[in-house]
């Protein structure tokens, strides 16, 4: 990694007294922080400290017998799961049994030129029996999605996620480079409808940044922070923070938790943005200005002016959403979008 990235400020490190303190620390948190040794006592972490083979054996003994989706990139990708020159994925996605996938990983550990192999965002409840129960972080009343990420040396381009994220390095080492949400203009984002994993990614090669092609990336770096996680360490990544992730060892395992403190019945903002691109962006400027005002009135600046003149029982989705009104709005959207 170039000196411009290794010299970045370190993400704040915090100390934790107990699980209750973690619950309080996460509540309303909007800045990233590292918790060293948070999961050091996990059986998975202890197995990984013995060897990569021991970690694989431990994971495999909990695996359900079903196909796993795996991504494989050629050795010359240098572990970067990205686009090729034609803007197609530079990796192939296939399915295989976990023993077969792990055998390929182990085979590559003795090779100078090995493919990058990556099992991304595997649901721990659906694909394993007892793995989550033996290796998890209590998160209070939250009901997170718990996923496991298993791979060789990999580089995952900077992207963001809507949920809050607690990322726990279980095996190997990982380097995270983080940027605040407002740095999207300086990260040179790629397509939103042709992505490696569903989120727009930075087109900048962090290992060899081309400042001629991406001059604003220097501005992004002025706001960046970095953390290198050892086995047992954890990192909190707030909602919408951009993160570039590197698996640094020949075998790496991450367990992460995604959650939102807002109700689950609320929709996905990315869906609204995508539809606005289709419906509003290419309108004449005068039309866009009208819709900008309407969005401000109904969404970004919504207050009592929107509903004060409407009888309370007739306000429907213009009032604060409930599970029932959100369901009606979702059904209405499905009908209109299917026309």
Language-model regions: role of each:
Residues 1-234, 244-339:
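N-terminal accessory scaffold of Fe(II)-dependent oxygenases
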């Amino acid at each position: 990694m170039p000196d411009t990235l290794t010299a970045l400020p370190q993400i704040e490190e915090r100390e934790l007294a107990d699980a209750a303190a973690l619950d309080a620390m996460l509540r309303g948190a909007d800045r990233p922080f590292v918790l060293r040794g948070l999961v050091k006592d996990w059986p998975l972490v202890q197995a990984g400290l013995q060897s990569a083979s021991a970690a694989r054996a431990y994971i495999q003994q909990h695996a359900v017998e079903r196909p796993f989706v795996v991504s494989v990139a050629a050795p010359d990708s240098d572990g970067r799961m990205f686009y090729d020159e034609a803007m197609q994925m530079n990796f192939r996605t296939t399915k295989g049994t976990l023993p077969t996938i792990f055998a390929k990983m182990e085979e590559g550990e003795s090779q100078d030129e090995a493919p990058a192999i990556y099992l991304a965002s595997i649901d721990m409840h659906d694909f394993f029996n007892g793995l989550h129960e033996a290796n998890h972080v209590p998160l209070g009343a939250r009901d997170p999605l718990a996923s496991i990420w298993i791979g060789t040396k990999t580089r995952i381009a900077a992207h963001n996620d809507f949920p809050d994220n607690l990322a726990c390095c279980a095996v190997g080492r990982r380097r995270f480079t983080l940027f605040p949400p407002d740095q999207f203009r300086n990260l040179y984002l790629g397509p939103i409808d042709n992505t490696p994993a569903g989120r727009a990614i930075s087109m900048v090669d962090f290992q060899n940044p081309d400042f001629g092609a991406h001059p604003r990336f220097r501005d992004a770096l002025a706001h960046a922070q970095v953390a290198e996680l050892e086995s047992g360490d954890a990192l909190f990544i707030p909602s919408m923070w951009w993160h570039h992730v590197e698996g640094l060892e020949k075998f790496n395992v991450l367990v992460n938790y995604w959650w939102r403190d807002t109700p689950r019945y609320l929709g996905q903002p990315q869906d609204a943005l995508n539809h606005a691109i289709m419906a509003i962006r290419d309108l004449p400027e005068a039309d866009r200005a009208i819709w900008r005002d309407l969005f401000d009135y109904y969404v970004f600046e919504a207050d009592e002016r929107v509903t004060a003149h409407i009888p309370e029982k007739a306000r429907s989705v213009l009032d604060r959403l409930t599970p029932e009104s959100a369901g009606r709005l979702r059904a209405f959207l499905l009908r209109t979008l299917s026309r």
